[in-house]
Amino acid sequence: MNIESQIIKATIYLRGNVEKMNNRGLYVGRFQPFHKGHLEAIREVLKKVEEIVIVIGSAQYSHNIHNPFTAGERIVMVRQALEAANVDYSKVWIVPVPDVHLHMLWVSALEGYTPHFNIVFSNEPLTRRLFMENKYKVKKITFFERKQYNSTSIREKMLTNERWEDLVPISVVEYITKIDGINRLRDLNRTDNV
């Protein structure tokens, strides 16, 4: 074996081992929109792992009442909120992942989109079950005022002109305002019935 082959082999070995050594957690959400409960969950996860992979789920959906924001817009919301909260961004990966509508393939599809992770943080029963069946360590996250910090209720408040701005980081308020997100959501909620 020549020296170049040995170097390549050693590099591949080291990369693989460094990748495996990272204590990296996975956190999946749609973030429609990103709110203070999400921010607290990420802070909690980062106390338990070296790095976090934040998966922007349902990445292919946007411009509908349940998923009004694009994957790109959600990435911006998450990133700006983390930066404003002084979260060490060198410990964060944000990855958009489209839905796979076949549960037995979802975990392997997600693995293909993300860097290696060795622990999953989720309270959602199906997510927990799918990862446990794939031999992942799965931990629950402490809910942070779940009834108040809930994306569905935040979208409903946006639609009904109720106060929602205190439920999301200020950077998210500013970004949703910039992209005219409230009017988008209201337009999506309209019907053409007479």
Task: Name every feature range the model reports, one short phrase each.
Residues N2-V194:
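Nucleotidyltransferase catalytic core that binds NTPs
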